[in-house]
Each structure stands twice: as structure tokens, then as C-alpha cells.
Amino acid sequence: MFILSLPAMASFNDLLESVSDETGVPTEIIKAVCTHESQSYHNGKRQPWPWTLNIGGKGLWFKTKHSAVAYAELELMDGTEPVKLDVGMCQINWYWHGNEFASVGELMDPRANIQYAANHLKDLKKGKSWEYAIGAYHSPSNQVRAKKYASAVLSSF
């Protein structure tokens, strides 16, 4: 089990506030998406975890950024196409969004990951509700799945 220490949580909250100020996406929305996407548990409390991968539907939590990036790079080199790889706190899908990043390591960076997710949520909102944007973040073409996902994310705060 991995634990975000109090200083790390303070730093995480500062990062969320900074990204919220830059993008206009409410801090609570960003935090809810991060926590839902990369959740780990400590003392029964859900928390986000930065060194998280999801490969083919299987969540993996790593102790360090280096180990997570190395594992992801091996998966990408194995020749299976397309690799179903979600990266970092906000579980950005490499197949759909990887071309926006120089490397998996860059996408794994918490600031880059959260910043990209917040900008993506902002783009998805398109004058609609944050609930709609959150649902489209997960399932842009399946409204039933999108609503279920948004409900699960929003129930966390």
C-alpha cells in the first residue's frame, strides 16, 4: 500500500489549486477525477496515486515514477497494437493522447498529467455541465457509461 504523506498531500492540493486557476476547472472536479482514476487506499481513505498505470483494464500501482515509466515503456515495445495504456493520476490514455507528449515519462509527471486532464475536461464541457464533461472524459461516445462514470466520480466529494 502506498501512502501520500501530509506534505505530499499539501503539495498535491497546491498543484490542484494552481491547475484550477490556470484552466478554470474547479479544484473539486480535478481532485475527484484524479482520485477516481488512480485511487489507492490508506486507513480506509481513498486517495490519488501518481505512479499508476492501467494496462488492458488491469490497474497497477508503482512505488516510483521510474518503475512505472519503465514498465509502461516495456509494454509499448512489445509490439501489441494498440496498447490499452492509461497513465498517471488522471489515467490519460496513451493511444488517444500520447502524441501530445514527448514520452511516457512526461505524461507520468503529475503536473503535466493533471494539467492535460483539466484542459481536456474544459474542452469537453463545451458550455455543458461539469457532470457531462466528466462523463465524456471516460466515455465520449456512450452516454449510458458516461452518466454512470460521472455519477461515481461526483459521489466522491
Whereabouts are the PLM-identified features?
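Catalytic glycan-binding domains that act on GlcNAc-containing polysaccharides
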Residues: 9-157
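N-terminal signal peptide c-region/cleavage motif recognized by signal peptidases
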Residues: 5-7
